[in-house]
From Swiss-Prot:
The gene is Mbp. It holds the Pfam family Myelin_MBP. The modification N6-acetyllysine is found at K146. This is Myelin basic protein. Homodimer. As in other animals, several charge isomers may be produced as a result of optional post-translational modifications, such as phosphorylation of serine or threonine residues, deamidation of glutamine or asparagine residues, citrullination and methylation of arginine residues. Arg-131 was found to be 44% monomethylated and 11% symmetrically dimethylated. The modification Omega-N-methylarginine is found at R44, R50, R131. It comes from the Eukaryota. The modification Symmetric dimethylarginine is found at R131. The modification Phosphothreonine is found at T18, T21, T36, T92, T104, T119, T122. InterPro entries: Myelin_BP. GO terms for biological process: maintenance of blood-brain barrier; MAPK cascade; membrane organization; myelination; negative regulation of axonogenesis; negative regulation of heterotypic cell-cell adhesion; positive regulation of chemokine (C-X-C motif) ligand 2 production; positive regulation of interleukin-6 production. PANTHER family: MYELIN BASIC PROTEIN.
Length: 195
């Protein structure tokens, strides 16, 4: 008798489980049925169209609106990761285009890579060539006043704004000037006010 009741209880519990999941699916309580469009669109937003299924492409009208706050170089079809990689390679290729044919045979690729990373920071004219990466670098440096990024235009501002500090700090480099001025600005020029 006990062996006959157990399978009947199992069948009953299975039936109840399937009925409850179907009931949840009908009313939309399972996150699987409700969130697939949002998750697909988020995945497509970050990884591009290659990995996401095509079924939700027509159902999400706000996907194009959510891309609008991005900069104009990231709006085209491939994913954001590819665009940033492309803009990075574009800046290095444009910056080293005349020398590239000579460098690749003579130098180690690692040395070539490090030279390409270091060179776009020092000359300000290279900012016009590689638009996406250097513009983001420049604006980031202007907002956060980070020393390595975009100090080309900021150094002249510092020089013109702080002419009173010139005497002792003229012999030092630009980076040390920015560090010293940043430290003094954060302490809110109290020595100048006392003088």
């Amino acid at each position: 008798m006990a062996s006959q009741k157990r399978p009947s209880q199992r069948h009953g519990s299975k039936y109840l489980a399937t009925a409850s999941t179907m009931d949840h699916a009908r009313h939309g309580f399972l996150p699987r049925h409700r969130d697939t469009g949002i998750l697909d669109s988020i995945g497509r937003f970050f990884s591009g169209d290659r990995g996401a299924p095509k079924r939700g492409s027509g159902k999400v009208p706000w996907l194009k609106q959510s891309r609008s706050p991005l900069p104009s170089h990231a709006r085209s079809r491939p994913g954001l990761c590819h665009m940033y990689k492309d803009s990075h390679t574009r800046t290095t290729h444009y910056g080293s285009l005349p020398q590239k044919s000579q460098r690749t045979q003579d130098e180690n690729p690692v040395v070539h890579f490090f030279k390409n990373i270091v060179t776009p920071r020092t000359p300000p004219p290279s900012q016009g060539k590689g638009r996406g990466l250097s513009l983001s670098r420049f604006s980031w440096g202007a907002e956060g006043q980070k020393p390595g990024f975009g100090y080309g235009g900021r150094a002249s501002d510092y020089k013109s704004a702080h002419k009173g500090f010139k005497g002792a700090y003229d012999a030092q480099g630009t980076l040390s000037k920015i560090f010293k001025l940043g430290g003094r600005d954060s302490r809110s020029g109290s020595p100048m006010a006392r003088r």
